[in-house]
Regions:
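Catalytic and substrate-binding clefts that recognize carbohydrates or anionic sugar/phosphate headgroups
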Residues: 4, 11-190, 200-201, 206-207, ...
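Conserved, mostly hydrophobic/aromatic
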Residues: 26, 122, 216, 259, ...
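Flexible loop/turn segments at secondary-structure boundaries
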Residues: 131, 138-142, 202-206, 232-237, ...
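Secondary-structure transition/capping motifs at alpha-helix termini
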Residues: 186-189, 217-225, 250-267, 292, ...
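Aromatic-lined carbohydrate-binding/catalytic grooves of carbohydrate-active enzymes
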Residues: 187-366, 408
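Aromatic-lined carbohydrate-recognition surfaces of secreted/lumenal glycan-active proteins
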Residues: 194-200, 228, 260, 264-277, ...
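Active-site-proximal helices and loops of the catalytic beta/alpha 8
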Residues: 230-233, 243-308, 360-397, 412-413, ...
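Catalytic core of carbohydrate-active enzymes
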Residues: 385-396, 403-414, 427-428, 435-445, ...
Length: 631
């Protein structure tokens, strides 16, 4: 998972059997025995130490360090009002203080619990210290979790060896940069990926797909990418084998050629599983390319939980799981993308990857399902990204749902399957910001929500408006997501949002370049952007987009927003007006409440700064050279 190791320094050891000191540059690590505990100094100031939570009848409530049958326990000290951030894509409060968080990738089936698709055992404190556990195994974090200890960070690592980084930085930006220096920087995504991505589950056939694409262009809707989800181009019973459903796509080339003629990029779906009903299953099993069952020595037959499926998304077939630890299987899967890219596909939606859930599973590498489970996502991401690097003429770029430490090297990720309601919108924003605080700079959500769609036009509008300021912007869910399907008022508001998105592309390009160089996400939480403002940290739903824009998404019906602006003067951003008035200026260090009209946004620029804007275009193949500065 590491792409490099830290620069080695000359270590100086002093001490005896009871106490040992290790000096390295500005750092000094003091180790004590009986029981083992430590203090970490930087420039002679304690920056972290073992938890000091004592107990009435014993020395420690929890051991500072311990090796158990389940793995390792490490307990770190927390200040009384100390916040902790990171730990991957999480839907609840960004400040993990008080939470029990598990670093384990789930098919979360929503955004309503602690379970999530993208995890990494990396956390940081505004006080400057960072913890990164370098392991593929599950890690449980009791972050000031009161049933364990409200004054300690308790880390339970389910591994035989303990490999962890504990370091200190002067700012959250430097903290994330250090973590990314270890695990890998994200390449800059192609410009077209910053445009609008249109999708749904799912276009029934080529006639519907082309009809929607033509309507998009006829209505002058800004859009760059159209997506064929899993059931849109594959036969569900026999997927996945890189085969077009012959009953609907006897010859897919003319269909893709027509989409190309309309200046669409094309995204197709995949998952790393092969139906037992496909001849490829027997071939892959014979070659040892599938995850095996320890009990039989044969390919493990994965059986789906049928409860999430219904009339639209029908049950999936029993399947084998591709073993990415087998070099030949990895190469086969990568090379199998070549015909898709040669046909005109530009992007892969790499779905699933969380299915190694059973310790009876065994990989070619000798790892069990539990040990391989998390890192499998990263191997899957890497394989697909390498295929795009090798064969895609317009990429590489993909959307992956599951991710682990290092997956940020293979952009980008999207936030799984949110419920189509206001809670789903709010949780999706938090998930995006949490992933960004964990080293993942590029993210998208399902605009409108994925499941339990009630055709709530106001929700759809607000979701689209918030997503204008995310790294990537995708309209997706069960059922149509074209703006006009929500009525005239919603369509007008979303069209305005999409037009603004394209005008912001020069600004967003700069933000993605900075993300690639520094690890700072396009969407930055207030805690990350304003680490020295304790009040700003409390506003977890608003965020910075790039360096200049504070975005206050509307996450409740009726248009009410509550927000805080840091110190200084701020100007309300309105790309349609190049001359802001005194009424558009807001004093910082204050809290505000407003009611927004359906077409209104609460976005602010620090007074004196400018935002570069491009022209109004419908896709990135159009001339975008003319730029202006706002204001």
């Amino acid at each position: 998972m590491l792409i490099t190791t830290p620069d080695t320094q000359q270590l100086v050891f002093t001490g005896d059997e009871q106490h040992c000191t290790v000096n390295a540059g500005d750092y000094r690590l003091a180790l004590f025995s009986a029981p083992l505990h430590f203090k970490l100094y930087r420039n002679d100031i304690v920056v972290q130490e073992s938890a000091t939570d004592g107990h009435f009848v014993r020395q420690h409530r929890l051991p500072p360090f311990a090796k158990t049958d389940a793995g390792w326990i490490v307990c770190l000290e927390l200040g009384d009002d100390e916040s902790i951030y990171g730990l991957g894509e999480k839907w609840g409060k960004l400040d993990k203080r008080g939470q029990l968080v598990r670093s384990y990738n789930h098919d979360a089936l929503g955004v309503n619990t602690e379970k999530s698709y993208k995890n990494t055992p990396y956390a940081w404190s505004p006080e400057g210290w960072n913890l990164f556990v370098h392991t593929p195994t599950p890690v449980t974090h009791g972050v000031g979790y009161a049933p364990w200890s409200q004054r300690a960070y308790v880390c339970v690592v389910e591994d035989t060896l303990l490999d962890m980084f504990l370091y200190h930085c002067d700012s959250p930006a430097k903290s994330i940069h250090t973590y990314i220096s270890l695990t890998g920087f994200a390449p800059v995504p192609p410009k077209w990926s910053l445009g609008v991505i249109l999708s749904k589950a799912y276009y029934k056939d080529s006639q519907e797909l082309l009809a929607v694409a033509r309507e998009v262009r006829e209505k002058n809707m800004p859009c760059d990418v159209i997506t064929l989800d899993g059931r849109a181009w594959q036969d569900t019973d026999t997927r996945f084998a890189f085969e077009w459903d012959p009953t609907r796509y006897a010859d897919p080339k003319p269909v893709l050629d027509e989409l190309k003629a309309m200046d669409f990029k094309i995204c197709v779906w995949e998952y790393p599983m092969i139906s037992v009903k496909n001849p490829l299953y027997a071939k892959a099993a014979e070659k040892g390319w599938l995850i095996k069952d320890k009990r039989t020595g044969e390919a493990y037959r994965y059986e789906w939980d049928l409860s999430p499926f219904g009339e639209v998304l029908t049950p999936l077939p029993d399947s084998g799981i591709l073993d990415f630890t087998h070099p030949d299987a990895y190469e086969f899967w990568k090379e199998s993308h070549k015909p898709l890219f040669e046909l005109g596909v530009d992007m892969i939606k790499a779905d699933f990857g969380e299915q190694l859930e059973d310790d009876n599973m065994l990989s070619y590498s000798g790892d069990s399902g539990d040990r391989l489970h998390n890192v499998y996502s990263m191997l899957y991401n890497r394989c697909v990204y390498e295929a795009a690097e090798k064969y895609c003429k317009t990429g590489p770029f993909l959307f992956s749902r599951s991710a682990w430490t290092g997956s940020q090297r293979f952009p980008a990720q999207w936030g799984g399957d949110p419920q189509a309601d206001w809670h789903g919108l709010a949780a999706s924003i938090r998930g995006s910001l949490s992933w960004g605080m964990s080293g993942g700079p590029f993210f998208a959500t399902d605009i409108g929500g994925f499941y339990k769609d009630t055709r709530d036009a106001e929700l759809y509008v607000r979701w689209a408006q918030a997503s204008v300021f995310s790294a990537h912007m995708r309209l997706h869910g069960i059922g149509p997501r074209e703006p006009w399907s929500y009525g005239e008022a919603a369509s007008d508001a979303v069209f305005n949002a999409l037009k603004l998105r394209y005008r912001l592309l020069p600004y967003l390009e700069k933000a993605t370049q900075q993300a690639s160089e520094t690890g700072l996400p396009v969407q930055r939480s207030m805690a990350l952007a304003f680490p020295n403002d304790p009040l700003a940290r409390q506003f977890e739903q608003q965020f910075m987009c790039g360096e200049s824009l504070i975005v206050v998404p509307c996450i409740v019906p009726g248009g009410k927003v509550k927000f805080y602006l840091p110190e200084g003067d701020w100007v309300r951003f309105n790309a349609a007006s190049t001359s802001p008035t005194d009424e558009d200026t807001y004093q910082g260090g204050k809290y505000y409440e407003q009611i927004l009209g359906l077409n209104e946004l609460a976005v602010f620029v620090r007074k004196g700064e400018q935002v570069v804007l491009g022209p109004e275009v419908e896709h990135t193949e159009m001339d975008m050279s003319a730029t202006t500065m706002w204001p």
